[in-house]
Amino acid sequence: MSFDERYGDGLMLAVTFGGGGLFFVAWQIAYLSELAASGVEIGGAQRVVGTSAGSLVAAVTTSGRLRRIQTELAAVARVPAVLALLAPSKDLHPSQLRALGLFHEADGAAPDTVRAIGHASLAACTPSAARLRRSTAIVTGRGKLSDPALRITAVDAFTAERCVLGAAAGTTLAAATAASSAVPGLFAPQPIGDRRLMDGGVSGTGVHLDLVAGARRALVLSLSDGTEPGPGMMTTAPGSFLVERSALEATGTEVFARSPEPVEVTELMAPAAVPKALAMGARQARADAAELRAFWR
C-alpha cells in the first residue's frame, strides 16, 4: 500500500466503509440512515471505498438503496432465525477450519502469509461461490458495478495481490461484494475475470485508506479505532489503523473516523446481535450529526 500515488487527488469528499461482519453491516446502515435523517447525506461522495462487510454498505449507498435496506434490516432483525440464513453455517469442514484458522491467527499481511491463507481458502470445502452471490444480491440488487465513484476491494486468493474493482471491471455489484466478503474458510473465493478473489480485509487493512489519499475530506467507518491493546489478528497488525490514518492525513486529507462501541468478536457474525448493532449505530450517529454536518460541507 502506497500513499504516494495519491489516488484521491482532486476529490472533495470521500468515504471508506470497513469490514466487520454482519454486526458492522447493520451498524453502518443504521449510522448512515440516522445521519441522513439528520440532514447529513453521504451519497454525494466522489469516492466510495468498500471492504468486506463495508462493500455491501458502499453498494447500497451508491445505488440509492440505503433507506430500503435499513427498513428491511430493522424488520428482519426482530426474527433472528431469518437473519441466520445470511450467516455462514456453524458446521464447518476440517478444510474450512484450516483456512479460517490461518486467517484468524495471522498477525500481519506478509505476501507469504496472505498466499497461505488464499491457498487454504481455495482448497476449502465451502458452499458454492454462486450461493454467496445470491445472498449478496438480496442486499445489492442485480445491477452492474457502474457507479464511477465506487471501489470494491478484494484479494487474489492465489497471488495475494490486492484487486480494486470499479466500473471497468465489467462485473455486477453482487459479484464484487461477494468477492470482497468471501471470508477464508467460510465462503468460496469468487470468480472475477481470470481471478479467484477473497475477502478484501485479508490484506492487512479493513479500510484501504490509500484509495482516498489526497482527497480534501474523508469519512472513515472502521470496526476498530486502533487503540485496543493486544496482538494482531486476521492479518491486521497492532496499531496498523493509526499508522494508516496518519499516512492519509499526511497527504493533506482531513479525516473524520468513527468506530462502534466495543463489541465481542463472537458478535460480529451473530444474527442475534443485529438489533444491538442497529441501536448502537443510530445512537452514535445522533451524537455525531452536528459535527459531521459541519465536516461534510
Language-model regions: role of each:
Residues 1-51, 56-297:
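Patatin-like phospholipase
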